[in-house]
Amino acid sequence: MSSNTMLQKTLLILISFSVVTWMIFIISQNFTKLWSALNLSISVHYWNNSAKSLFPKTSLIPLKPLTETELRIKEIIEKLDQQIPPRPFTHVNTTTSATHSTATILNPRDTYCRGDQLDILLEVRDHLGQRKQYGGDFLRARMSSPALTAGASGKVMDFNNGTYLVSFTLFWEGQVSLSLLLIHPSEGASALWRARNQGYDKIIFKGKFVNGTSHVFTECGLTLNSNAELCEYLDDRDQEAFYCMKPQHMPCEALTYMTTRNREVSYLTDKENSLFHRSKVGVEMMKDRKHIDVTNCNKREKIEETCQVGMKPPVPGGYTLQGKWITTFCNQVQLDTIKINGCLKGKLIYLLGDSTLRQWIYYFPKVVKTLKFFDLHETGIFKKHLLLDAERHTQIQWKKHSYPFVTFQLYSLIDHDYIPREIDRLSGDKNTAIVITFGQHFRPFPIDIFIRRAIGVQKAIERLFLRSPATKVIIKTENIREMHIETERFGDFHGYIHYLIMKDIFKDLNVGIIDAWDMTIAYGTDTIHPPDHVIGNQINMFLNYIC
C-alpha cells in the first residue's frame, strides 16, 4: 500500500513538472514572437522616419505625437500628393505627346492691343492620338520678341481633365512669338515625384576630420544606414540632423571640411527614364500660329505704388524689355550708380544661401567701385565673402547655407550653420536687410528636408520681426536651370515644387519677394547662374525694396 502511494506521488510530481515545463516553453515562444513584433514595429517606424516618410500610417506600438512642424510637413506633403498622383503607364505611347496635342488661340484677331490678354486652349493627347483624361503635365509658357530683348512668362491653368488654359498678358507692342513647352508629361512628373521621395542616397557626402597633422575622410549624410558608431550633429529646436561615420581616434568635433559626389543610383524604371531623354524634354507644342502683332492702341499704363516689402507678386509679376526688368505690380525705379550709392549708405546687408546669391556679391563691386572685398583669411569659392565701404559705412556679406550643400569642391564647415540660426544672430534695424535663397541643393533629396528648412526660416523671420520689425527681409526664389541635365537629381520639376511651397509658407510674412523663377523664364536663360544683366535686374528689384 505504501509503495503504491509512493508511486502515485512520484507520477504526480513528474506530471506536474512536465506541465510546468510545457507552460514555460509556450510562454517563452509567445514572448519571443511578441518581442519580435515589437522590434519589427520599431525598425519599421525608424525606416519610415529616415528613408521614406515621417508619417507612417500604422504602427504596432504607440508613437509620440507629431510636433507642430511635423504636422505642417505632413499637411503640405498630402496636398502635393493630391496634386501629383501616381500615373503608371504600360507603354510610352500612352504618355502625353507634344506632336499630337493641339493648342488653339481663343478668339484670334489680326492685331492685339498692348495690355490685352491672349488665351490659348491646350488639349493634350498621347502618342496614339487619344485624348488624355487627366492633367499634371509640366509645362512652360513664354512669349518673346528677340528684336526688343523682351520676354515674359505665361500663366497655365490645369483643369485636370487633359485641357489647359494658357494666358499671356501682352505687355509690349511689336511682333510677339508664343511658346508652350512640354517639359515633362504628367507620367514623367509623377515618376519624378515618387523617385525623389524614395531615398536620401542620390548624393554621397564625405566629411574630412582633421586632428593636428592627420586627417581622415568618412561617409556622412542626412541619414546613414549603418550599425557603426556615428557622429550626430543635431539641431533639436528645428529638428535638423546630419550624421557622419565616427573615425577612429578622432572626436566628432574634428569634422572640418565636406565634399559631395553623385551616387550611381536611380529610383526610376527604364521605361520611366526613357521619358527624360534629351529629345523628349522641352518639346514645343505651338505648331501653327506662333507670331502675333501687338499695337499700342493708345492704352495708358496704370501708375502703381512704389515697390514695398509685403507685396505679393502675381504671375507673371513683370516682363523684360530692352533687357530691363519691369514689374507689373509696383512702380519699380531703374537705379543708376549715384542712386545705388545713396541707397547703400549705412546699410548692413546679409546674403544667405547658395551660389546664385554669391553672384550678387560679385556683381556689386562692378557697379559700386568703392565696395572692396575684405580678406577674412578663408579659402575656396564657398568661403564667407565680405564687401566693405568704410566711408559710407556699408557692409555686404554672403554666407552659404548649411546641409545639404552639394559640390565636388571641398568646403569648410567652420562658421557654418543653418539659415535660421544665422538669422537668430542678427539684431536687425531699419538699415539692415537680409536676402535668403535656398532650393537648388535640396533637389536631390526627399521633399520633407526642404519643407522643414523653409518652416525653420519662416519661424526665424518671425522671431526677427518681434525684436526688430523694421528689418527688411527679401526672399529670392530659385532660378530655372539647364533643361538637359540629370533630371531625376536636379531637374526644374523639383524646383517648381519648391516654388509652390515657398509661396505657401511665406505668404503671410511681411517680406519682399524677388520672383527669380518668373524672371529667369522671362529672360529665357535656362542656366542655374544667369548672366550679369539678369543679376543686375534682380539686385535692382532688391534695392527698390530696401531704399
From Swiss-Prot:
The keyword Cell membrane does not apply. Residues 1-21 form the signal peptide. Gene3D superfamilies: Immunoglobulins. Transmembrane segments: none annotated. Its main location: secreted. InterPro entries: Ig-like_fold (IPR013783), Ig_E-set (IPR014756), NXPE4_C (IPR057106), NXPH/NXPE (IPR026845). Pfam families: Neurexophilin (PF06312), NXPE4_C (PF24536). Glycans are attached at N39, N211. GO terms for cellular component: extracellular region. It is found in: Secreted. Keywords: Glycoprotein, Secreted, Signal. Belongs to the NXPE family. This is NXPE family member 1.
